[in-house]
C-alpha cells in the first residue's frame, strides 16, 4: 500500500509528527516519524501528542478498534478498511478537531495536493476533558501511589496517569493529573507528549502500575524522553526493573514510604528517558505497618499542613490527629513532617 499522498497531504495540513506501526512510509525530512512495535502504542502516543495541541498522523498496517477519546490537536489514523470520506488530511484534521474525536481514513486514497501550512498547536491543561472517571474520592491509608502524587503536586509536574488507583492523583488534595486514558496507556501517551513537546521532558511524568507495562511503549519512551513512575504493588511475579533495562531505561528503585526520596528522584534534572520504580503493597491487600501506627505530638506540631497534603484518611483536623483505627503504619506522614511532631505510637 502506498501512503505517499496521505503523508504529503498531512504535511501540507501542518502535521509534523507520525506514529507508525506495521506500515512502511517515506516522509519529508522535517517530519518526525516514530516506528512503534504495535498499534496500541502508536494510537495512544498520538493521543499524548494531541494533548500538546499538535496535529498527529497514525499509520497502521492493520485495522483496529480506535478509542473513544477527545482530542486537542487533530488525530488522523490511516488503516486498512477505514471508510472516512475526506478530500485530504487537512479536512480530516479539521473534522477531528471540530468533532473532538479521532478520525480514521483509507491510507491509499487519491488525496489532492495542497499548499503547505506550518505546524501549529499549544498545550492547555484540561484535566476535565482528558482524565478518565474514577468513582472513588480518596486513596486508602498506606496507598503506594500517595507519595508519588504528593511529590508530583509539590513540584508542579505535568502528569499523565493510567487506570485504577493512578486516577486518584486527580482528586483532592493532589489535583495532579493532566490526562489519563486507562490501563496500559500512560507510557505511550507520555512518549507522544514529549515527542510533540521536547522541551517538556524535564517537567512531565507518567504514573502507571507495574502490571500495565509493555515493551513497545518503553522502547518508544526511550527515544522520546520523559519520566515514567512505575508503582509496583507486588501483586505478581513480574520484573519491571529488568523490562526497563531491556528497553534502555536504567531504573531508580525506591520504597513507597520514602516520600522524600521520591521527591528527589522526580526533581532530578534529566533530558532523556527515566524510570522510577516505587515498591509497596496495595493497602487493600496488606496492612503495611504490621500493627505499627503513628500519632502527633501537639506540643511540637506547628500546624504547617504538610501531613494534611498527603490526603490520608487517617489524618484529620487543623491541629492534625491520626486515627489509630485507620492508620496503616506506612510512616509517610512522619517523613514529610519537618518538626518531628509525628512519631510511632508507643
Model-predicted segments: where are they?
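Thiamine diphosphate
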Residues: 17, 24-96, 163-235
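Flexible loop/turn segments at secondary-structure boundaries
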Residues: 25-27, 43, 65-66, 109-112, ...
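Terminal amphipathic helices with adjacent charged low-complexity linkers/tails
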Residues: 97, 101-128, 345
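Phosphate/pyrophosphate-binding active-site segments
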Residues: 116-150, 251-258, 264, 273-279
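Iron-sulfur cluster-binding cysteine motifs and their immediate structural context
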Residues: 302-323, 328, 332-346
Amino acid at each position: 500500500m502506498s501512503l505517499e499522498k496521505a503523508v504529503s497531504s498531512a504535511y501540507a495540513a501542518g502535521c509534523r509528527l507520525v506514529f507508525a506501526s506495521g506500515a512502511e512510509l517515506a516522509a519529508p525530512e522535517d517530519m518526525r516519524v516514530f516506528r512503534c512495535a504495535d498499534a496500541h502504542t502508536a494510537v495512544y502516543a498520538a493521543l499524548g501528542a494531541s494533548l500538546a495541541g499538535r496535529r498527529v498522523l497514525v499509520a497502521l498496517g492493520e485495522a483496529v478498534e480506535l478509542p473513544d477519546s477527545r482530542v486537542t490537536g487533530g488525530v488522523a489514523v490511516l488503516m486498512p478498511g477505514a471508510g472516512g470520506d475526506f478530500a485530504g488530511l487537512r479536512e480530516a484534521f479539521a473534522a477531528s478537531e471540530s468533532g473532538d474525536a479521532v478520525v480514521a481514513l483509507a491510507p491509499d486514497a487519491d488525496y489532492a495536493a495542497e499548499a503547505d501550512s506550518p505546524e501549529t498547536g499549544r498545550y492547555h491543561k484540561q484535566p476535565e476533558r482528558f482524565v478518565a472517571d474514577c468513582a472513588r474520592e480518596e486513596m486508602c491509608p498506606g496507598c503506594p501511589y500517595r507519595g508519588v502524587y504528593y511529590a508530583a503536586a509539590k513540584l508542579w509536574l505535568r502528569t499523565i496517569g493510567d487506570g485504577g488507583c493512578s486516577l486518584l492523583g486527580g482528586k483532592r488534595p493532589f489535583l495532579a493529573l493532566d490526562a489519563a486514558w486507562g490501563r496500559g496507556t500512560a507510557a505511550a501517551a507520555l512518549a507522544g507528549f514529549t515527542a510533540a513537546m521536547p522541551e517538556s521532558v524535564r517537567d512531565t511524568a507518567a504514573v502507571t502500575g507495574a502490571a500495565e507495562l509493555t515493551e513497545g511503549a518503553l522502547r518508544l519512551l526511550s527515544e522520546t524522553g520523559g519520566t515514567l513512575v512505575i508503582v509496583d504493588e507486588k501483586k505478581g511475579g513480574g520484573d519491571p526493573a529488568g523490562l526497563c533495562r531491556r528497553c534502555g531505561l536504567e531504573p531508580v528503585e525506591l520504597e513507597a514510604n520514602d516520600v522524600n526520596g521520591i521527591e528527589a528522584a522526580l526533581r532530578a534534572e534529566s533530558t532523556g528517558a527515566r524510570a522510577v520504580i516505587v515498591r509497596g503493597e496495595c493497602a487493600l491487600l496488606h496492612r503495611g505497618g504490621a500493627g505499627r501506627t503513628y500519632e502527633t505530638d501537639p506540643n511540637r506540631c506547628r500546624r504547617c499542613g504538610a501531613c494534611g497534603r498527603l490526603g490520608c484518611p487517617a489524618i484529620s483536623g487543623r491541629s492534625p490527629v491520626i486515627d489509630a483505627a485507620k492508620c496503616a503504619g506506612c510512616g509517610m506522614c512522619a517523613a514529610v513532617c519537618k518538626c518531628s511532631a509525628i512519631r510511632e505510637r508507643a
